[in-house]
Amino acid sequence: MLSVICPIYNEEKYIAKCIDSILAQDYPKDDLEVIFVDGMSTDRTREIVAEYTAKYPFIRLIDNPERIVPPAMNKGILASKGDIIMRLDAHSTYASNYFSVLVKALYDLGADNVGAVCKT
């Protein structure tokens, strides 16, 4: 399973586009979980993510009262079920093959870590 972790805080302007690009991924949804770790947003970020979590069971929202990225990643990793961890940024959108290309590269190269350049 691929566990995608996305730390978020006050992302209401960007989060829907980010999630829509996640939903457009060609990666199998039955082998995917997406965990948004929210730093207690004060805008509509949580409401927007909640609309998606209600429709898509592989998307979750957890809290990060510490409000900074390192604890958000740690909380996301602890909550994850996958054997592969991927980090995303909420300000970005992702090509529909982004997940599958990175996972394939990880296995093909026998690498411990792979990354990509994204346009934000």
Question: What is each residue range found by the language model?
Answer:
Residues D38-E47, S92:
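A conserved acidic beta->alpha catalytic loop
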Residues I85:
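Short aromatic/hydrophobic "clamp" motif used to bind/position activated sugar donors
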Residues S21-D31:
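Short, acidic, metal-binding catalytic loop of nucleotide-sugar glycosyltransferases
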Residues D31-M40, R60-P65:
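Short beta-strand/loop segment that forms part of the nucleotide-sugar
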Residues Y14-A16, D43-E51, N97:
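Acidic helix N-cap motif at the loop->helix transition within catalytic regions
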Residues M1-S21:
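N-proximal low-complexity "stem/linker" segments adjacent to membrane-targeting elements
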Residues N64-S80, V101:
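Glycine-rich, basic loop-to-helix element that forms the pyrophosphate-binding segment
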Residues N97-T120:
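Conserved donor NDP-sugar-binding/catalytic core segment of glycosyltransferases
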